[in-house]
Amino acid sequence: QLRCSPRRISRLMKELDIHSVTVNKWKAASASKTKVEQRPNLLKQDFPTTGLNQKWTADMTYIQTKRNGWCYLSTIMDLHSRRIIGYSFSKKMATDLVLKTLESAVKNRTITGDLIIHTDLGSQYTSDDYNQRLTELHIRHSYSRKGCPYDNAPMEAFHASLKKECVYPVPVFEDYETAAAVLFEYVHAFYNRKRIHSSLGYQTPLQVEIAT
């Protein structure tokens, strides 16, 4: 085991003309400075279901591009099949983005019973417009506890797969249009139709839905 004092390290770095590199930690921008109080967590990490359209989960993730900077992918997942049923991609992180995702999910499904949608406490999801639309659709809104990603673990797992299998290999998309095309292909052609899940008995989301 080698021992070396900070002073010696500093001296050697100067002699060899070596400079340390400081990387600024990237911090996600918030669309609102308003402090959000805790809201009801109806799901409480109870992810299992007995059928479709009982529990949905929604979230956004950041996608970097060279020409357009950060872009935003918004999705909704049905927890029964783990299928992405709502999808929207935008250059702006706004309430319109998550509303568009919600409308795409509703268009793809027939809601007949009690349905919960679970999100974080982001300003887009706590907005009056979003919650008014949920009320109109008779969908109950559940929220993660602040700073607790485990409350939305299935969506966190989806984002991890997306980044590992689709985003990081690039490593940075040229522009918004390129990212949009690649992400759409990954979600709709691969993730929903071909990617097997151990939690689904090594079936794809589409196979589960067909069998339901």
Language-model features and meaning:
Residues G69, Y87-T110:
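Active-site beta-loop-alpha junctions of metal-dependent nucleic acid enzymes
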Residues I9, M13, L43, D59, ...:
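Mobile genetic element proteins and their domesticated derivatives, centered on retroelements
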Residues T135-I139, L162-T212:
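C-terminal domain-tail junction helix/linker
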Residues Q1-L2, P48-T49, K66-R67, L121, ...:
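Conserved, non-catalytic sequence blocks in retroelement Pol enzymes and Pol-derived host proteins
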Residues S81-Y87, H141-Y143, Y168-V170:
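Short small-residue beta-strand/loop micro-motif enriched in glycine and branched aliphatics
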Residues Q1-G51, C148, T204-T212:
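Basic, flexible linker segments flanking DNA-binding modules
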Residues T49-I85, K91-K92:
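An active-site-proximal beta-strand-loop segment
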Residues A29-S32, T119-L121, S127-Y130, Y143-K163, ...:
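RNase H-like two-metal-ion nuclease catalytic core shared by retroviral integrases
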